[in-house]
Amino acid sequence: MSKQLAAQVPAEPVVLGKMGSSYGIRGWLRVFSSTEDAESIFDYQPWFIQKAGQWQQVQLESWKHHNQDLIIKLKGVDDRDAANLLTNCEIVVDSSQLPALEEGDYYWKDLMGCQVVTAEGYDLGKVIDMMETGSNDVLVIKANLKDAFGIKERLVPFLDGQVIKKVDLATRTIEVDWDPGF
């Protein structure tokens, strides 16, 4: 099915998607892509999965659209039983495979866990998720336990220059112009 590569494992793993249920009897699987354009997941190779705590490299043999789904065929996965063993496995690549971004652009993975503070120094909390709304991305911030406003979660639009004043990935902080009461 796949070969284990002790020497070649992702140094900085990034999850790009997940394998879904098997499709048919010849080892095809549904795939759920987390990339902005769903088909972009196929641009990043090799893929790694984790089985029983060990990294394994899997090779994409083929992929195609089926109704609303993307389905994949992996080398060495030739029947439904082998495919079922991979259901729910995350598709991982090394972050070095991702393209470099322009100044002011960030990967969501880099913003996760950043502390968010207002320009006045009020600690809003930590980024726990991101949402795509169509017009702009939104930071989902888990507020600190002793938040002065009693807020558990904040949604702050990622509008560079307007709301987002400074992103410092080295110190893992994001400075925002935002009313802590919201």
Curated annotation (Swiss-Prot):
It comes from the Bacteria. One of its GO terms (molecular function) is ribosome binding. Residues 103-182 form the PRC barrel domain. It holds the Pfam family PRC_RimM. Gene3D superfamilies: PRC-barrel domain, RimM. GO terms for biological process: ribosomal small subunit biogenesis; rRNA processing. The keyword Cytoplasm applies. It is found in: Cytoplasm. GO terms for cellular component: cytoplasm; ribosome. Keywords: Chaperone, Cytoplasm, Ribosome biogenesis, rRNA processing. HAMAP family: Ribosome_mat_RimM (MF_00014). NCBIfam families: 16S_RimM. An accessory protein needed during the final step in the assembly of 30S ribosomal subunit, possibly for assembly of the head region. Essential for efficient processing of 16S rRNA. May be needed both before and after RbfA during the maturation of 16S rRNA. It has affinity for free ribosomal 30S subunits but not for 70S ribosomes. Belongs to the RimM family. The PRC barrel domain binds ribosomal protein uS19. Binds ribosomal protein uS19. This is Ribosome maturation factor RimM. It comes from Salmonella paratyphi B (strain ATCC BAA-1250 / SPB7).
